[in-house]
Swiss-Prot record:
Record Pfam families: Lactamase_B_3 (PF13483)
Entries under InterPro entries matching the protein: Metallo-B-lactamas, RibonucZ/Hydroxyglut_hydro, UPF0173_UPF0282_UlaG_hydrolase
UniProt cross-references to Gene3D superfamilies, sorted A to Z: Ribonuclease Z/Hydroxyacylglutathione hydrolase-like
One of the record's GO molecular function terms: hydrolase activity
Annotated protein name in UniProt: UPF0173 protein PYRAB01190
SMART domains: Lactamase_B
UniProt family annotation: Belongs to the UPF0173 family.
Species classification: Archaea, Methanobacteriati, Methanobacteriota, Thermococci, Thermococcales
Disulfide-bond pairs as recorded: none
Amino acid sequence: MKIVWYGHACFLIKTKGVSILIDPYPDVDEDRMEKVDYILITHEHMDHYGKTPLIAKLNDAEVIGPKTVYLMAISDGLTKVREIEAGQEIQLGDVTVKAFYTEHPTSQYPLGYLIIGDKRVAHLGDTYYSPSFKNLRGQVDILLVPIGGRSTASEREAVDIVDIIRPRIAVPMHYGTYGGGSAEGFKRELQRRRVWVLVKDLKPYEGFEV
């Protein structure tokens, strides 16, 4: 499995012959992206949906997201669009995607995604801490967790989320663009709280394989 962070909450996940892009924000550089088959959107806010129409058309990719995203994509002239709800499970080739509710009060239908391929990756979109995340414990190898603290988890709340889910690897996101937070601050808070996890501190357009 290959995971690339394109900045903000935007990631590319390549596994089992499938390329999945998540939350392409307005400033992401589509010219630096690999080919994508599917675009998963966690919710309707423009810092997560931004370049979806352009990238979908360039790649002939299917867009998948909650009801508001479905309606936005249709209104933008996209035809390969699928709606997904919390609790629903779909197959993208040999990859399983499970949608779950996240705690983002300013969104109508906020979702996170558990992507099951060679490894299990959870993308939390925009979220605060939620006790319901305990349901993910034991299911997540790599956690993509927001730390920026602007309408989403702060560094401290992100540690609470890591502590309740207990992944093997945590990748901080949703910082350095809109809002505060830093990977170093997140790592310091993990150490201070004695929450042990391997942190992948990526630079935009940098990736790793697991």
